[in-house]
Amino acid sequence: MTKDRLAALQAAQSDDEDMPEDVAVPVEGSFMEDFFKEVEEIRMMIDKIQANVEEVKKKHSAILSAPQSDEKTKQELEDLMADIKKTANRVRGKLKGIEQNIEQEEQQSKSNADLRIRKTQHSALSRKFVEVMTEYNRTQTDYRERCKGRIQRQLEITGRATTNEELEEMLEQGNSAVFTQGIIMETQQAKQTLADIEARHADIIKLENSIRELHDMFMDMAMLVESQGEMIDRIEYHVEHAMDYVQTATQDTKKALKYQSKARRKKIWIAICVLIAIIILVVFLAIYLT
């Protein structure tokens, strides 16, 4: 392999001497350099989504803890959600592109170290992406439940208690009037309660639209990661067993060295005993013959 690379470099150098100076010569490995740049770009986008998800959580808490609807905070929340959606679609597109390139090379029966590296990187990025989007989905679902709880408490204040099932039925109708009918708005508090109920209902509608928009993308990536799971598990299995084999081999080597050392010492002791026996025999014969 080293000789082949050396020959290729020498050939490239020879060709370069015959070329004009302004002609660019492709450098071996430039494809993988571009790939790793793309990997880093995808990783940074996923990190950006993760950071935005944390900001979304803060906005949710700020909105729910505010006594009155804060339009500025709501707009900031919508901007964050729009940015997450935009970035997530870009990540999905890039991961899909890498996946298609890998599949094309596999169909051409290409198998090399670079391909395995790309598959491993693609799998790691896909898993990370799904983890981040799962957290985002969980954040949205949690916010929806908290908005429901807020509506339920406000309805109780107005004297209209509702069960969770009844509240879900009202939400499915998509009309805030079903929540506010029968509420007498004679006081400022009643008006504020009505406004809060309508605001929370509007938040839930936006959340449900956002969840639906991201659902297909989320399921697509989740299925991809699941299909990669068996391959990754097999790789981890073989790596673990390889490590076990190395550890076992190391222990066996230590045992062999230990046994070899014992055997060597035993041979030395036997030689010493034989030598002593010979000396005793010589002395005995010398005395006897004398």
Swiss-Prot record:
Record's bilayer topology term: Single-pass type IV membrane protein
Molecular functions (GO terms): SNAP receptor activity; SNARE binding
Coiled coil: none
Cellular compartments per GO CC: endomembrane system; plasma membrane; SNARE complex; synaptic vesicle membrane
Compartment(s): Cytoplasmic vesicle, Secretory vesicle, Synaptic vesicle membrane
Effect of residue 243 to V: Very poorly cleaved in vitro by PMP1 LC
Keyword match Transport: yes
Effect upon mutating residue 238 to N: Very poorly cleaved in vitro by PMP1 LC
UniProt-listed GO biological process terms: exocytosis; intracellular protein transport; neurotransmitter transport; vesicle docking; vesicle fusion
Signal peptide range in chain numbering: none
Record keywords, A-Z: Cytoplasmic vesicle, Membrane, Neurotransmitter transport, Synapse, Transmembrane, Transmembrane helix, Transport
Domain of life: Eukaryota
Site-annotated residues for (Microbial infection) Cleavage: 240-241
Positions in the Vesicular compartment: 290
Location of the t-SNARE coiled-coil homology domain: 194-256
Pfam family, one: Syntaxin
Entry annotated with the keyword DNA-binding: no
Function in brief: Plays a critical role in several secretory processes.
Protein name as it appears in the record: Syntaxin-1A
Organism of this sequence: Anopheles gambiae (African malaria mosquito)
